[in-house]
């Protein structure tokens, strides 16, 4: 995708919900100042503290810690599984080492903060309701479609991953 996506990389919080996005560093600036302006080291991150009070997650929670699973890895999503309760978990099909990497990434970024769990749970419930109405294949195929701006729907990967489509 060219340019910055219209949503935060890990949290998938869209601009439309009123949260400002900021640049996050995959390798923290404090660990490698040479990567500060390296585009290959940047991703979009939400500004959490203004909207969730003290519930910091994603870039604000990361601080100077390294991420074991980079959001820029081609297979990044394969490290995670989304439970029907909205929680993000390590993919049980991975090796023990890979599960530990996923678990550490979830912990570092606080990807199971209340606001993210609530949002994921909501999209899963909406998807289940649509599946009952339209059928599983129709709904999941629609999630792969981009909007007029070229972006996927917020949290699109949650039901796709939950229903094992990606």
PLM-predicted stretches and their roles:
Residues 9-57, 63:
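Histidine-centered nuclease catalytic patch
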Residues 55-98, 104-111:
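Long, low-complexity, intrinsically disordered segments enriched in glycines and aromatic residues
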Residues 1-8:
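Active-site-proximal cofactor/substrate-binding loop regions of enzyme domains
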Residues 96-166:
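C-terminal, charged low-complexity interaction regions
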Residues 5, 15, 100-103:
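Intrinsically disordered, low-complexity segments enriched in glycine/proline and serine/threonine
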Residues 5, 41-42, 77:
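Short, surface-exposed beta-edge/turn micro-motifs
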């Amino acid at each position: 995708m060219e340019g910055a996506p219209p949503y935060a990389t890990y949290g998938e919080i869209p601009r439309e919900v009123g949260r400002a996005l900021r640049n996050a560093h995959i390798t923290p600036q404090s660990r490698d100042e040479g990567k500060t302006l390296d585009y290959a080291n940047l991703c979009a991150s939400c500004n959490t503290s203004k909207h969730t009070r003290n519930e910091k997650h994603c870039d604000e929670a990361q601080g100077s810690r390294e991420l074991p699973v980079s959001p820029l890895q081609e297979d990044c999503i394969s490290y995670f599984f989304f439970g029907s309760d909205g929680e993000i978990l390590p993919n049980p099909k991975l090796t023990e080492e890979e599960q530990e990497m996923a678990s550490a990434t979830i912990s570092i970024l606080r990807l199971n903060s209340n606001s993210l769990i609530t949002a994921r749970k909501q999209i899963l419930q909406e998807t289940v309701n649509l599946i009952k109405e339209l059928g599983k294949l129709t709904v999941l195929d629609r999630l792969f479609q981009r909007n007029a701006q070229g972006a996927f729907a917020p949290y699109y990967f949650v039901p796709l991953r939950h229903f094992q489509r990606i």
